[in-house]
Amino acid sequence: MKKLNFIIVVIGALASCKGTDVGNPPIDFSVVPVQTVEGMVARRFERDNLTYDMRAGRMERFEYKDEDGTPQEYELYSGGFEVLGYSADGLLETQINADGARHNTVAGQEQWLAFGNVHIQNHTKGEHSLTDTIYWDRAAKKIHTDCFIQMYSPQGLMQGYGMESDEKAENAIIRHPFDSYGIDRDSTWFYFDSVNFVGPLQRF
């Protein structure tokens, strides 16, 4: 049986109540958060192994019903957003940084997106990408964007519009590439993962 633990560490949490004072107009919870968290850190575990770290300068949670009476829920992250993804061996594999993010929940369906100066890095492969908005399908374990994207790797640069990849950014594919540049390297070159490096560097 798959064991899933989710631990949230909160620094300086402020929560607002849904009640209203007598004589005051009702609060519009579509614009007023029901919860605010400053300096949020979240950790996700699977089978007792750390899989994700998530950090944000500020998180605001909104809960309300739209004009049709449909419940709406979302969390808005601002002040910087970061997700760190780890491999089964505990290595820092993927890093996503952005200006902000949003987590929507509508009729039980989830949607994650990060926006503003999005930087996606795969440290084990030495690859990183730059774009404006990235979407994460947590159930399918995939990420994608429809925006302009630049992808850098030890082999060179590729750029275009639209990208699809697994959530670890290991097999990213640009849907509509229009430009690329290659790098010629000699046979002695190799990629060195300095992020996960432990111990002296050995060359044979």
Where are the predicted features?
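Mature-chain termini and adjacent capping regions
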Residues: 1-204
